[in-house]
Structure formats: C-alpha cells, structure tokens
Amino acid sequence: MRTRLRLLAPLMLSTACASVSSQAPDATAAATATAKDSVPERPFGTLREQAERQQAWLRERMDTALPQLMRKYGIELWVVPMREYNEDPVFKALVSPTTFAARRRTIYVFHDLGPEKGVERLALGGGPQGGVYVPRRAQQQVNHGGEGLRQAELWGPDQWLVLKQVLEERQPKSIALDVSRTFAFADGLSHGEYEGMAQALGPDWVRRFKPAEGLPVDLLAWRIPDEVRFYEDETKLAWNIIETAFSNQVITPGVTRISDVEWWMRQRLADLGLDTWFQPSVDVQRQGATEEQLGEDPVIQRGDVLHCDYGVTALRLNTDTQHMGYVLREGEKDVPAGLKAALKTSNRLQDIVFEELRPGRTGNEVLKSSRQRMASEGIDGTIYSHPIGLHGHGAGAMVGLWDRQEGVPGNGDHKVMANMWYSIELQATSLVPEWNNQRVRSAQEEDITIDAEGRVHWAWKRQTEFHLVR
C-alpha cells in the first residue's frame, strides 16, 4: 500500500458520489451486474463457515507455531496482558474469530513445558477461545438472577495476584513481555499495565522480565497451510474487482473521475460483506501533464495511464495489490510499445526481488542484493516491500521504504522466515518514446507466499499486461 492522502470537502465527496449515479448510471449498473455474475455474493461462505475455518487456523497456530517460536527465542514463559479496546497487536493471532476485544482485562500466559508436554496456555480473564486456553476465574460466587449463583470473573488488581500465584507455582527463570523499541508488533504492553503488574508482582519477579521481541512478530507472521489455500481465492477476488474497475464497465473516458473508481472499488467489497484495510486509491499519468496540472481528482481521459492500490480484508487476512491500466485513444487497438516496455521493466524488478527473498536473510540483505542487481541491469526503480497477513503492513522483516533505500535499521534487520507472506511492492521509471521520452512510473504490488521449505510462490499470479479501458 502506498501512503497517499486525499482531503475531500463534504461537497466534493457528494459530487463525486453523485457523478457515479448521474453521469454514468449504465456503466455502474453493468459493473455491478457483471461482478455479481462472476463472483458469488458470499465468496468465502457464510460467517459461520468462515469462523469455523479461522478457529482451525488458531488451533494449528497454537499447537504448531507457538512451541517452535518460543524455543527459537529461548522463552520459557510469556505473559500478554491487555485491557478491553487497548489490545496488544498480537491479539489477532491469539483469539477466536468470535472474539473482537479483550474481556475487561485479559492476561494470557504461555508456559513451555518441553517438547513432550507442549505449551500450557492459560487465560486469566476472558474465555477459553474455543478450548484453546484453560481459563481462570475468581473464587467468589455471585447471584446471577434467574441462573442462581455463578462464579465471578477475575477483576481489577486481583488479576495480578492470580498471575503471581501462577508464576509461583511454575517458577520460571525468565518472563517474556511485549516491550520493544524496535518492533511495534512486539510493543503491545501498555505503560499502565506494566506498572500495575510490576507493583503487584514485586521486585523478585520484575528482575526476571525480558523483552519477547521476535516471538510476537514471528507468531503474527506465521501462516498455516490452509490459510495459503484461502489466500489464493482472496487474491483472485482482488484481481477480479480491479479488472472490472479498470474497464468500460466502470470507467467512461471523459466522464468518470478517479474518486468514482475508488469508491466503486470500496463499495464492491461492502456489497460482498467484506472490508478493506485502507482507502482504495487510483491515480493517472498523462502525456505532457504534471501531477500539479492533473489535480487531486482528475477526470479520466483517453490516453491516460491508470494505477490503483487496493486491499481486501477477509477472515482477518489482508491482500495488497497495485496494478496498471491504460485508456485506449480513439483508433488505438493496443497499448503503445513504450508503455509495454515500462511494465516489462517493473516485471523484471519483481523477478529480482522474488529471487532474492529467502528465509534466513534479513530484510536489509534482500534490499541490498536486489538493488545491486537492479543497478547492474540499468533499472531506475525503488523497492519497498513488506510482510502481510493478519495486518496489511504486517509483522516481519521490512524490505526497504520508498524513502529509505539504504535500508531500514531495526525492522529491516529482522530475518525473513518460512511460512510467511510478503507484498512485493516496487516501482520502475522508464522513458516512453511515444510520450516524447516523458518519464512514466510503473508501480506494481503482488502478494507472495513462502512455504515451509522456503520456496517462494505468487499468491495467485502477477500482472504482465495492462488492464484496458476501450
């Protein structure tokens, strides 16, 4: 996803939305009809079916990934406290699809008992998450109306005393916490929660605290084989919507504005019962025109080069796709050769990053070697690829930023691992002879998966030809 900000006044928003319905009603209706014909209205099944699949992913993640990662980082016991609506970033990797927030205060405790017994999982507050955790509740019984007496939930400072009891029973040599100055995904423990916990546990236990660092990062990044199977379908859906958006079913040259296309793309997801993790964006490049001359929300004209950035969110998993399109001029039957060459150049840069992205290498190492090959082949480009999964800009080793091509300290020093996904995001700029050697930017983004053996695969495929508006 590119960082892009468009500020629209309410009047501009209403005008943009009105233009879809009043200026090009037939195109919009056709787009909706075509999309409905080609994509089921429940592309991933009912919510219940989706939740059952997600619950299986959670169980496998806890049974398979968590023990391996705790041992990889030498973590005996991991404590993850959080309060309702102030959840740790790793929350998404720890809970069932029917859990949307922490319960009052929830303290998850993970204790590695060794390869034979596995990892003990406790929930001090909150529920068992479909049998994944053993919950602890308060001792007192309270009257619950017609249900009679019911065991109370853990509440307030007493929860820390229950945690202290758990620690005293298990006597871990160290206690890993989510505090980090490097990784946002490993820095989920709030200052208030830290203070309350430290005060209740006392100095003897506080001395055993240590940062969890890579554990929450890699747990968030770790993908299950069935998630990979699902991701192909999710990526296909993103492609389907982009293909329709960059066609005459949505775009009428000389009438449709880029904001019309953006809102159509977002609305299409809402109509399917899905969501996105960022506002879709569309931009144009035009022969002889600068960005300033085009303005914030230009009308799409014949001869324009189109670019979009689009993400789908489904079953808590995210896609991130950037594609190129072209609006044929009157009498044109194909994309000018110079523009085709520009797309081919960015495809070549994709090849390079695809080949360099390997488990065991740091993000900065991947960036450096990719840029060296890029320079040796005379490509004028930038690389800013990132992990993706439970978050759009996901946990794991960062491979460049658009404005930090020398490397990213900290985040870029983390290592790529097997069983994770990336968005290969980059751009190559080329001179286009048909445009009087104007510089044209071909920006592409496609998602890839890395399997358990470290092999890299496109999540579905990658764009090698322009989408055409005729």
At which residue positions do the language-model features occur?
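Bacterial signal peptide processing site
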Residues: 18-20
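Bacterial N-terminal signal peptides
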Residues: 8-16
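Ser/Thr-centric signal marking residues that sit
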Residues: 3, 15, 451
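Bacterial N-terminal signal peptides that target proteins for export
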Residues: 1-9
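Active-site neighborhoods and metal-handling regions in enzymes and metal-associated proteins
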Residues: 24-470
